[in-house]
Amino acid sequence: MALDGNFCDSLRDGLLTSFVDASLASEQNLRAQLLANNMSGSGTKVISVLEQELSRCQQFDFSVAFITMGGITPLLQTFKELETRGIKGRILTTDYLQFTDPRALEKLAGLSNIEIKFFRTEEAGQAGFHTKGYIFDQGQLRSIIVGSSNLTQTALTVNQEWNARLVSAAEGEFARQIQTEFDALWEHSASHPLDDVLDDYQVEYERTKAVRQRFFSAEPKLSAELSFREIRPNTMQKRLADNLLALMQKEDLGGDISVPKKGLLISATGTGKTYASAFALKAIRPKRALFLVHREQIARKSLQSYRHVMGNDYTYGVFIGQQQETDRDIVFATMQTMVKHLNDGPFSPTDFDVIVIDEVHRAGADSYKSIMEHFRPKLWFGMTATPERPDGFDVYGLFGHNILTEIRLQQALENDLLCPFHYFGISGLEINDKDYELKDFSKLVSDDRVDHILKQSDYYGYSGSRLKALVFCSSNEEARLLSQKFNARGLRTVHLSGNDSQSAREEACRRLALEAGDEALDYIFSVDIFNEGIDIPEVNQVILLRPTQSPIVFVQQIGRGLRKHDTKEYVVILDFIGQYNNNFLIPVALSGDRTYNKDYMRRVVATGTQVLSGPSSIHFDAVSRKRIYEAIDSARTNTITSLREPYRLLKFKLGRIPSILDFDVHGLIDPIKIFEACGTYYAFLKKMEKDGEDFGEMDAAAQKYLSYLTQRLGNAQRVSEILVLELILNGEHDNLKSAFIANFVRRFSSNPSEAHLQSCERILTSNFWRTQKEKEDNSNCAVIEIEEDGEWRAAGAFVSTLSANQLFNQELKDLIEFIKIRYELTYEGGYGNTLLKLYERYTYEDVCRMLDWSRNITAQNIGGYFYDKSSRTLPVFVNYNKDDHAIAYEDHFVSENHMVALSKTKRKVSSSDADHIFKRTSEDKDNRIYLFVRKNKDDAEAKSFYFLGEIYAEGEPEPVKVKGDDAFEINYRLRVPVRNDIYTYLTS
C-alpha cells in the first residue's frame, strides 16, 4: 500500500470504525478484522488473507507452534514468488508435542529468502510454545495477525479459529511490542538455526509418530463379519438409500406394474457411488441383483464393496470371461461378457429384481441397448459422475428423467466427501494448441520441458510417505516418450494405453499404490484410460500436460486423486498451462459453475481458494493467470454453437422443452447470453427446435414487443418497468402511474423520484434511444400511453397483442419472473441512493438508464466521462490498460481506494470539466461522481464496466500535456475500496 501524508488520519479513521462506531467511513484495509474460516457466512478462509498479506509485504515474520505440509502447500506458489522478488522472511517454530512436520521445514528451508529457527522447549525449562502470530512489514505500516491458527491445513481453512488482524504504524506501541517479543524469541538461547537441530528432531518426530500409530492400532478389532456391518453411509449414500426406498414403495396408480422403475445417481468422482448403490440395495432388499460394468477390475472391486456393506445375507459372484458364477444372489458382470451370452446364456429376462449399470453415460452404445432390451427387472438403476455426453445421447431419458440424488464436485467438497486438493496453474514452456495439433514432439518431450515438469513436481510435492503420481498427456506417443525420459533420470515410471492388457494395468496400479520397495512406481503416464473407472485412492499428485478441452474430462482426471485414503491428507494437482484457446474452461471446471459467466470465471482465477469449500485451494502463477484472462476475454460464450449444447443437456434432464427459468434453477448457461445471441428466448427456441418439437407460434407484432422488452429489460438491472407490466398482465389498464407508485412504495419503502418516473415512462413508451435507426427499429413498441393529466394507460396495440397470442402472454410472464428473480439475487440493494449495484457491470446505455438520464448518450460522447446537468451526475469510465492504439491516458490505481486519472484532452485546469470534477462552484457542490472500470477492450463479447462506487477528486487539478494537448491529472479517492478479487483482476 502506498502511504501519503494523510496516513495518520486514515489510520485513525480505521481505528474509530473498528472500536468506536462501525458506521463511520474508513479504509477497509486499515480496520481491525476478525479472521475466521467462514465460507457459509463471510466467505473467508484464513489462508486467503495470509496469501494477500504475503503478496504485498516487504518482509515477514511468523511465530507458530505447529507447521505441517498441509499448511504450507497452499502457500508454496506465493513463497516462490516472494523468493523471486527478494522478499525475505523469518519463521520461528518449535518441537512442542513433536507435531511440526520436518518435511515441511525442509521444504521451507529450500527457499533462499526464508530463514527458519527451531525453539527447543526442553532447553527453555519445559515451557510450552503455543504462539500463532504473523507480522507483515509494509514500510511505514505493520499488518499483524494473532490468534489461534497454526500453519496447518485445517487451521487455515476449516477449523473454528479466531484470529485478529490489526494494523499499526511501524512506530506504534502495539507493533513495537509484538516485534520486540518476536525478536526476543528469535534470539533466545533455545532457538536454533534449523540445520543445527533438524536431524535430531527428525528422529524424535518419527519416534513420537510411531508411538501414536501404535496407540491407535491397539484399539480392539471387530470380527470381519461385524466390521462389514459397521461401515456407515456418508450423507450422499444415505440420501440415495432413502430416495430409492421411497421410489420402490411408491405405488404407480393406474400404471403397468410390469414396467420397471428407473432411477439415476449423479455423483462426483470419488464420492463412493459403488458403496452408495450397495447401501441403496441393502435398503430395498432385492432377491437378486445384477451389477454391470465395463471393466473386469471394477467388477471385482465392486463385489468386495458390496460384501463389506451387505455382509453374508447374500451370495456374490462374477460373470466375466470364463468365470461364470451364475447362481449367486448378486452377480457382477462385464458388459462384454453379458452381451456375448444374452441369447444362449444362463439368465432369463426376469432373473434379476434390480440391475445396476455403472458409468451409465456409456449406455448409448449398442451393447448396452441390447442388454436393456433383453432384461425386465423391477428397477433399472444407473450411476455416473458425468451424464452430460457430447455425442448427443440422452442419459436422463434412459432413466425416465428420474434423478434420485445429484451431487457435483462443489457439493461433494462442501460435504467432506472428497480428499482436499491444492491446484496449481503453472505456466508451461512456450507450447500452444498448434504444437499439439502438429504433434511437435521436439517441444512436447524436450529436455527443457522434462526438467521443468520434474522441478515443479518436486517443489509442490505430495502428501504421504512418497510420491504416487498420475500424468495425463495429449497422446500415447507423448506419454511413452515422457515416461522414457523420466526413467532415464532415475525415476520409476510406466506408460499405459488402451493396448495394455487388464493384468498390466492392474499391476501398474498395484505398484503405484505401494508404500515402499523397489517395485514402487513414482509416475504412471497415460492419455485417457484413467479418466474413469480405475480406482487408485493412494494417488497423491495429478499432473495435467494437455490443453483443457472439456470441463467433464478435466474433472474426471483430477478426480483420480480425490478419493480419500489414510495415506494422504490432500492431493496436489499440477496443471501446466500453455497458450491454449480453451484455457477459459479451467475456472469453469474448477468451480463447477456452468453459467459461463465471465465475471465469475475471472473471480475464480483471482481468488479461487475463496470459491471452494473446505481445505481445497486454487492458485495460478502470474503467467498462467494472464493466459487464462486472455482466453476468457477472447472466448465466445454467447454464440448459437456454444448455447446449443447446454440447451440440449437441460432438455434431456427435464424431458421437455425448458423455459427460460429452468436455466438458472439448474445452474446452466446464463439466459442473458441467449438474449444477446438471439434477442429473445422465443427466437432461440426457433433455432433449437427447427426440426424438433412444436412449441407454438407468435405473430410479428408479438415478436417485436417481446424483442424490445427483452433487450431493454432482460438484464434485470431494475424492476420498475416490470411492476407496470405486471399490472397490465393482471388486467389493470388505466391509472397505471398511480398504481405503479403505490406498488413501488410497497416494494422499496420509498417514493420514486420524478426523474425515475420520467425514465420509466421513456422506456415504456419506446422513447429512449440513441440514433434515428434505433427509433425506427423500436417504433410501435409502446407499452403505455400518456394521458393529458400525465396518467398512464395501457397501449391499445399492446393489449390487443396480448389478447391475441397466448404464447406471447406466457413468454412475457416467464421473462418477468426471470427478471424479478435475477434482480433479487444480483441487483437489489443499490449503492447509496442509486439503483447501481457495486461490482456489477454496466454498459454506457445501462448507466444512462440507471441514473435516470433523459437521453441515451452515444458511446463516443459519453466515453471518458459525461456530466448530466439535470441529475448532477458525472460517471467516469476508465478503460484500464488501454491498447497501444488508444489515446495514451495513464489512468491507474495506486491502491484499492486511490486512482490517478487524466481528463479528456484539450481541457485546461480552468475548464468547466474541472469545475464539475473538483466541485468548485456552488452549482457543482452537490455533484455525484461515479467510477466505472473495465479491463481493456479485449473481451470479445462484453463492453460493460464494473461499477466501483462514488469517487471524489482530492487536491487540485494538475496540468499535463497528452500528445501536445492540454489535459489535467486528477487524484480520485474511492468511498469504498475496491473488492480484492476485482482489484486483482483489473490490475494484474
Residue ranges and their predicted role:
Residues P551-Q556, R560-L590:
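Conserved segment of the helicase C-terminal RecA-like domain
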Residues I403-L470:
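Conserved interdomain linker/interface between the two RecA-like ATPase lobes of SF2 helicase motors
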Residues R300, V318-F319, Q323-Q324, N343, ...:
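Conserved helicase ATPase core of P-loop NTP-dependent helicases/translocases
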Residues R362-H422:
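Post-DEXD/H (motif II) to motif III coupling segment of the RecA-like Helicase ATP-binding lobe
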Residues K704-L709, R718-L729, L835-S944:
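Acidic, glycine-rich low-complexity segments with interspersed aromatic residues
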Residues M1-N234, K238:
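PLD/PLD-like phosphodiesterase catalytic module centered on the HKD motif
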Residues K250-L281:
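Walker A/P-loop
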